[in-house]
Amino acid sequence: SFSSIRKRSTNSIIMHPEILSISLFWFVTAYTPGPNNVVASYSGFNFGIKRTIPHILGVTLGFTSLVIFLSIGLINFFKLFPVIQTIIKYLGTLFLIYLAYKIASSTISDETKKENPVKFIETFLFQYLNPKGVSVAIIVVSNYVELGDNYINYATQIVILAFLFSSTSITLWTFIGKFLRKFATNDKFIKYFNYAMSVLLLLSIITFYI
């Protein structure tokens, strides 16, 4: 009937009742230091904004796709097999240790002659191995996406927020790295900056086990 169609139409524009708390949670988790943000600053510092775009896209599209898959049912897989999260944590740790080594061992000639070691496909796939990102996505989808009349509506809003916060936060951290480049008056500064980024990356691993 016309009334039922009108009702469905009205429901289709209902905002999630906890949209503000979700947004605050996304904001805090997205903008605080983490593996993706540290690598973004490193890349922005050493390679500039343009050559960091693959990393920005990899994080944004990778994390958003993770939230989409969780929203359409992958979340149940994690609930049935919680050991999967433990495996992800260890695999993510190994990848970050490897990346920290690459950053710390990079030389000035590497940065000027070679392309950015942070590739799109590596960054995209890492979103599925990033313990912080996976945990955050699972928490949000588990608590805020429920089956029902507004399932598609709410899930869509969650995905949009994931895209917005991941893209803006990773871009901001890239610009922070680019800005700090202005203070790089000699090769020693660049070397120490890369060491600092490598250490921050290793420190971010500790948070996975707290």
Model-identified regions with their sequence ranges:
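Short, Lys/Arg-enriched N-terminal segments with co-localized hydrophobic residues
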Residues: 1-14
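Juxtamembrane transmembrane-helix termini in multi-pass membrane transport proteins
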Residues: 16-79, 83, 139-158
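Hydrophobic residues within alpha-helical transmembrane segments
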Residues: 24, 53, 57-61, 65, ...
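Alpha-helical transmembrane segments and their lipid-water interface positions
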Residues: 36, 58, 62-74, 96-99, ...
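Hydrophobic alpha-helical transmembrane segments in multi-pass integral membrane proteins
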Residues: 69-71, 129-139, 200-210
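Selective transmembrane alpha-helices of multi-pass membrane proteins
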Residues: 79-108, 166-169, 173-176, 181-210
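Flexible cytoplasmic inter-helical loops of multi-pass small-molecule transporters
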Residues: 105-118
